[in-house]
Design a protein with these regions (language model features):
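Active-site/substrate-binding loop(s) of hydrolase catalytic cores
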Residues: 82-83, 98-245
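Bacterial N-terminal signal peptides
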Residues: 11-20
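C-terminal accessory segments enriched in acidic
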Residues: 3-9, 23-61, 94, 186, ...
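Di-metal (Zn2+ and/or Mg2+/Mn2+) metal-binding site signature of metallo-dependent hydrolases
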Residues: 78-86
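Glycine-rich His-Gly loop
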Residues: 64, 75-79, 215
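A short, Lys/Arg-enriched amphipathic alpha-helix followed by its capping loop at the start of a domain
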Residues: 87-100
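Short glycine-rich or small-residue beta-strand-to-loop segments that form or flank ligand, phosphate
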Residues: 70-76, 177-181
Length: 366
């Protein structure tokens, strides 16, 4: 190869690498706020050291004219779990609050959205219809980008000293999993600081109910790549995990029964495992008066046995099915809370499961 041509190729490669690095560093998911949004803030408003970093997530406030209860929706904790992010987008782009305050973080792990999912070959962006034509939904990695944090330890250890149940000592990457790092530390790793900022938001805004929207593998039979034996996946799919507080468990049980009856799907619920430290549903509820929940929908992209999963239009588990369930569950929890408290969150213009199954997601995205 001629020296001049070699220099040109090396220069082009350097430009591509720099461009990719810059893209990851400055990437923010596309959020198009509706008229109901009162203001936008940042996670760093609750913990200043996050300002200007790739862990500083946008926060959207949808506030009613009448005071009432404050509730939080967390989407995008794991950027590969696309239904939670999309459901949070629909709230930001459609919801109007009449009473109380709704606080939404559509893309909590903004760092993870800046990189490709490290466990699959699923595309970074997925084109979907919307009211203005088409838009791209992002698909990233479940953890914070390595470049935004120091090297992983060999074994992850929660700030309490606990290790992950069943750990074999090779799970150090979980140090970059926001949903293993609650309640967080003000002077900890960037991931711990992001979790700490969420806790500070919960406390300072006097949040009474929070839901963290996630996805799991699908309830399907397949063969293990390691053992070759058949197994049934998706234990967590269609699961509402409730903080063990009596009120949270009672609210969760009633919500699961009501939503199951309406949508014709057998949903499940269980209490947080107190030995599994760092998860939002356990730690948020234990560290505050908030009733904290986590809801899992089945995502084909979580199935290790699928060669080319379709995370948007899968025949059995399409995105509108999963987003509809996330919103149906959240709204049911809100309604049940309102029935037993004097302070309420009252919303309108939030699509339910039936509407999204009929309309698809396009009519509800700006």
């Amino acid at each position: 190869m001629a020296p001049k041509m070699k220099r040109v190729l090396l220069t082009a490669a350097a430009v591509i690498l720099c461009s990719n690095a810059a893209f990851a560093a400055f990437f923010r998911p596309d959020v198009r706020p509706g008229y109901g949004v009162s203001r936008r803030g940042w996670l760093s408003d609750y913990h200043a050291p996050l300002k200007g970093t790739n862990l500083d997530a946008p926060v959207y406030y949808i506030e009613g004219e009448k005071p009432g209860a404050a509730m939080v929706v967390l989407g995008g904790t794991h950027p590969r779990e696309i239904a939670g992010h999309t459901a949070a987008l629909m709230l930001v782009e459609n919801a109007k609050v009449l009473e109380g305050r709704l606080i939404v973080i559509p893309a909590l792990n903004v760092s993870g959205y800046g990189i490709h999912d490290q466990s699959s070959n699923i595309a970074r962006f997925h084109r979907v219809p919307c009211r203005s034509g088409h838009r791209l939904l992002p698909f990233g990695d479940r953890r914070v980008d390595r470049s935004d944090q120091s090297a992983d330890p060999q074994q992850y250890r929660h700030q309490s000293g606990a290790v992950i149940l069943g750990s074999k000592g090779h799970d150090g990457a979980e140090a970059r999993n926001i949903n293993r790092n609650y309640p967080g530390l003000p002077d900890g790793t960037p991931t711990q600081q992001a979790a700490y900022a969420v806790m500070e938001m919960i406390l300072k805004e006097k949040v009474v109910l929070a839901i963290d929207m996630h996805e799991a593998d699908t309830p399907s039979w397949s063969y293990s790549r390691e053992t070759g034996q058949p197994y049934h996946g998706g234990r967590l799919a269609y699961m509402l995990v409730c903080n063990p507080k009596d009120e949270a468990m009672e609210l969760g049980a009633e919500a699961v029964v009501d939503v199951s009856d309406r949508v014709g799907i057998d949903l499940k619920y269980e209490p947080s495992n107190k030995q599994f430290r760092g998860l939002s549903h356990l730690e948020i509820g234990d560290a505050s008066p908030c009733l904290s929940f986590l809801f899992e929908t089945p995502n084909p992209g979580q199935d290790s046995w699928r060669e080319a999963p379709d995370v948007v239009t899968d025949v059995r588990y399409p995105l509108n099915h999963r987003v509809g369930l996330q919103l149906e569950m959240f709204c049911e929890l809100v309604d049940l809370y309102n029935q037993s408290h004097t302070d309420h969150l009252v919303m309108k213009h939030v699509p339910d499961y039936k509407t999204l199954m009929e309309d698809g997601i396009g009519k509800w995205l700006n």
